[in-house]
Amino acid sequence: MIYDYLTMRVKLNIPTLQALTNNEAFTYFCTLVAISKNPDSTIKDTVRITGVSETTIFNHLKKFEEVANLTIDRTGCSNKYSYTEPTKFFVTIDSSLLDTDVDRLVIGFLIRFKCWSRIASNIVDLSLNRIVHEIGVQHNTVYSALEAGLVKRSDKKLYFKFIHPSLCIL
C-alpha cells in the first residue's frame, strides 16, 4: 500500500488502542493521519487511505468519538474532524507504516502491539502465546509481521523487538 501522504508522526493514546480491534486500530490511525495532513478532511479521505467501506468507517468513527480523543463537528455541510493529541500514556507511530506491504489487520495489530512495549524502548516482553492471549490476535497475524520484517523475535523467543523505522520512534 502506498499513500500520497508525507511522512508524519501520530501520537496515539494507549488505553484507547487497547480497547480497539486490529481493524479499528488501523482505521483510527488512518483517520488521524488524514486529519494531520488536512484538518478539513472528510470520511472520503479515510476511505481512500484505508480501502475500507464508508459504512464501516462511519461505524468506527462513532466508537472513536466515544472512547478516543476524536471530535466530530456535525454543524456544517460536512462533518469536520479534530483530534487532541494525548499528553501522557501514548505511543508515537510514523505514517510510513502505511507504506508497508502487509494486510491492514497486520498494521492494526502492530499499532496495538506498540502499546505493550517497554517504556522508552522498542521491546515487547511477551512470548507468542502471551501475545495471542493478552492482545487477542491470531498466530498468523504475528507471523505475517515477522515475515514482513517489521518485528524481530529474540533468539530465546521470550520477547519481540520492533525493527521497522515507523515503529521505532521513542
Annotate each predicted stretch with a short phrase:
Residues 47, 132:
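The alpha-helix within a helix-turn-helix
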Residues 65-75, 147-160:
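A short, conserved structural fragment
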Residues 76-84, 157-168:
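Minor-groove-contacting beta-hairpin "wing" of winged helix-turn-helix DNA-binding domains
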Residues 1, 133, 137-143, 147, ...:
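Charged low-complexity intrinsically disordered patches
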Residues 1-45, 56, 75-125:
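Short recognition helix of helix-turn-helix/winged-helix DNA-binding domains
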Residues 52-66, 136-148:
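Short amphipathic alpha-helical interaction segments
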Residues 28, 32, 106-111, 140-146, ...:
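Extended low-polarity, hydrophobic cluster-rich segments
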